Amino acid sequence: MGSVTEKVPEPKKWILNAFTMSSPGHVASGLWRHPDNQTHRYKDITYWIELAQLLDGNFHGLFLADMLGVYNVYKGPGNIEPVIPGAAQFPISDPSLPIAAMASVTKTLSFGITASTTYESPFLLARRYSTLDHLTNGRVAWNIVTSYLESAALNLRLKTQMQHDERYAKAEEFMEVVYKLLEGS
């Protein structure tokens, strides 16, 4: 047992991040039916502004997941019919676009955005994220993914999804280019 004069360490502060998508249905199928749910407003900039204001000061960040394809594997490959009624991350819009508006009405909230090294252009991604970095005063982060959905490849005019090792080799080169483009931006 320690002595009475020992200092009790300060409890560690929690880091809280909200997690959503620019879609009416995220990871909880059917949640869009809850009476208080507002995700049906995902195409309305005031929805994103109100969400950011609600989170600012109480959460450290808002993480916006993204995907470039549709979960089309249930009941056979290429079948999107089961996805639509459940709004299973569908439809989905570009999560980076409302960030500047959200940053303009918040003081401390950070924004994490998913972007794929498989399908993005290093120059265009560096340009977009550098712009967001400046507009948010450094409150933007990148969730780096290589993508995995066959439907994403098809959406982007490829015949098939790249194999795992090929995607990760491309990601390594992609990151080197993006780092160089972002240096000093």
Give the residues covered by each predicted segment.
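Short amphipathic alpha-helical surface micro-motifs
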Residues: 1-2, 125
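N-terminal beta1-alpha1-beta2 module of alpha/beta enzyme domains
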Residues: 2-105
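Flexible, glycine-rich active-site loops centered on histidine and acidic residues
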Residues: 11-12, 19-21, 26-41, 117-185
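Active-site-proximal glycine-rich helix-loop-beta segment
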Residues: 58, 107, 136-138
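Short beta-strand segments at enzyme active-site cores
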Residues: 59-66, 111-112, 142-145
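Conserved catalytic cysteine-centered active-site region
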Residues: 104-113
